[in-house]
């Protein structure tokens, strides 16, 4: 740091500043800020600035006062060697020396405090897709980077995301197949190269994208000779096959193959109830996992001296029914769903003085504005599709522009019933979902209107 400034040198600088401000005229009076570039262009000012070590000079909005000193209205922003830009009031000449010492002591303390806070604070996490590849219709790859983490945090997030990607992300699969004129899964079918068991294995590997949470029906009705592929399946609008060329069977003669498929949505792997199989209806071990594999790695780096941070890399392979980025978003939302119960406030008992009745309302209905704001921040990021309500109720909410749980809490039960095509059963489904996942009840009508 430069040597301590003399009182006379500081006084010279202050006088130059005053003279420069007066020369700026009306513009300086209208605005509380002036340009350091304008001031430095004045004769004699640069020399004073260089002697004092003041490398930046401008008026600023924040004010610092030194106790016990007489201060004048002139405000100077000083950047002493090695210090941050700080605003202080320039005192009269006789107090310059004391002001300088106090300023330096205060500035030194502020620097130490700022550096400590900077080293302890966590910057906002940022994520980016650094690589993506479509290696085939049924194999998509994506690589993502997330940073900055404090030491140890990246591994925690990596383990959680890997497990959520493999076990929590929903996908669609064939759960049951009903063959026409077939009694046993091992019986040979005339004009069909494969046995029913072989066809069931092929159906198990079908990659299907579903936009509905409800079970769906699909039909295979093909006439030979020739191959039967996924593109031959008659699907409802909510279903789509990822790879239409995926093989199902081969018909060697001019015969028909008729199969009815049950398509469901779920997570992970589910064993079919084979004890119910019979009379041409066969249950399949369903693989709902759209994520084929997920890996993560953690790399450390120094963001600044003695401050170590981490970057997390996530690698995701999907079967093509969803993209790796969609899988990443869904896994994160699943983790949020798992942790939300820990954030639920306890119910408060509120007395209705008009009716002398005690009713229990959630904090989302009656509480302080601060608590309400904190709660709404959480629920603004929870979308209504995460309530896992029937598609009819979900579609009605979307048409009413109710996208999040926070939006939903603005409505009473009577308000919901006034939405077109929204019946009592849909309201009951929503009430059940809100109570199960968030311990929230919607009032029948606005209690403030009673």
From Swiss-Prot:
Molecular function as annotated in GO: DNA binding; DNA-directed RNA polymerase activity; protein dimerization activity
SMART domains: RPOLD
Gene3D superfamilies: 5' to 3' exonuclease, C-terminal subdomain (1.10.150.20), DNA-directed RNA polymerase, insert domain (2.170.120.12), RNA polymerase, RBP11-like subunit (3.30.1360.10)
Entry GO CC: chloroplast; DNA-directed RNA polymerase complex; mitochondrion
SUPFAM superfamilies membership: C-terminal domain of RNA polymerase alpha subunit (SSF47789), Insert subdomain of RNA polymerase alpha subunit (SSF56553), RBP11-like subunits of RNA polymerase (SSF55257)
Pfam families xrefs: RNA_pol_A_bac, RNA_pol_A_CTD, RNA_pol_L
Region (Alpha N-terminal domain (alpha-NTD)) location: 78-346
Entry's localization field: Plastid, Chloroplast
The keyword Chloroplast belongs to this UniProt entry's keyword annotation: yes
Signal peptide range in chain numbering: none
Function: DNA-dependent RNA polymerase catalyzes the transcription of DNA into RNA using the four ribonucleoside triphosphates as substrates.
The family this protein is said to belong to: Belongs to the RNA polymerase alpha chain family.
Entry domain remark: The N-terminal domain is essential for RNAP assembly and basal transcription, whereas the C-terminal domain is involved in interaction with transcriptional regulators and with upstream promoter elements.
Miscellaneous remark of the record: Unlike most plants, the gene for this protein is encoded in the nucleus, thus the protein is synthesized as a precursor and imported into the chloroplast.
Protein name: DNA-directed RNA polymerase subunit alpha, chloroplastic
Organism in which the protein naturally occurs: Physcomitrium patens (Spreading-leaved earth moss)
């Amino acid at each position: 740091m430069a040597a301590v400034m003399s009182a006379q040198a500081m006084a010279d600088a202050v006088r130059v500043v005053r003279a420069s401000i007066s020369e700026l005229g009306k513009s300086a009076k209208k605005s509380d800020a002036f340009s350091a570039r304008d001031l430095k262009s004045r004769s004699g000012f640069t020399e004073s600035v260089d002697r004092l070590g003041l490398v930046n000079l401008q008026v600023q909005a924040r004010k610092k006062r030194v106790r016990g000193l007489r201060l004048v209205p002139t405000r100077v922003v000083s950047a002493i060697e090695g210090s941050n830009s700080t605003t202080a009031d320039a005192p009269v000449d006789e107090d310059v020396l004391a002001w300088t010492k106090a300023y330096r002591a205060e500035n030194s303390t502020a620097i130490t405090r700022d550096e400590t806070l900077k080293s302890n604070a966590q910057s906002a996490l940022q994520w980016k897709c650094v690589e993506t590849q479509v290696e085939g219709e049924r194999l998509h790859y994506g690589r993502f980077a997330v940073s900055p983490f404090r030491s140890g945090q990246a591994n925690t997030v990596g383990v959680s995301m890997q497990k959520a990607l493999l076990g929590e992300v929903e996908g669609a699969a064939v759960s049951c197949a009903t063959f026409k004129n077939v009694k046993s899964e091992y019986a040979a079918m005339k004009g069909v190269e494969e046995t029913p068991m072989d066809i069931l294995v092929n159906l198990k590997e079908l990659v299907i994208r579903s936009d509905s949470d409800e079970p769906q029906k699909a039909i295979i009705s093909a006439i030979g000779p020739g191959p039967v592929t996924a593109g031959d399946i008659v699907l409802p609008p909510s279903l789509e096959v990822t790879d239409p060329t995926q093989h199902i069977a081969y018909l060697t003669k001019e015969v028909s193959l008729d199969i009815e498929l049950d398509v469901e949505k779920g997570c992970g792997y589910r064993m079919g109830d084979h004890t119910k199989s019979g009379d041409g209806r066969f249950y399949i071990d369903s693989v709902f996992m759209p994520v084929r594999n997920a890996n993560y790695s953690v790399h450390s780096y120094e963001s600044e001296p003695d401050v170590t941070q981490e970057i997390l890399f996530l690698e995701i392979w999907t079967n093509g029914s969803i993209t790796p980025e969609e899988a990443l978003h869904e896994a994160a939302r699943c983790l949020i769903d798992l942790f939300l119960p820990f954030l639920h406030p306890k119910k408060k008992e509120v007395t209705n003085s008009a009716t002398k009745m005690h009713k229990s309302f959630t904090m989302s209905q009656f509480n302080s504005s601060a608590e309400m704001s904190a709660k709404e921040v959480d629920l603004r990021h929870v979308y209504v599709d995460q309530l896992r309500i029937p598609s009819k109720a979900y579609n009605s909410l979307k048409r009413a522009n109710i996208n999040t749980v926070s939006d939903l809490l603005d409505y009473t039960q009577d308000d919901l019933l006034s939405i077109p095509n929204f019946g009592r059963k849909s309201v009951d489904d929503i009430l059940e979902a809100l109570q199960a996942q968030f311990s929230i009840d919607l009032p029948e009508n606005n209690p403030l209107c009673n």
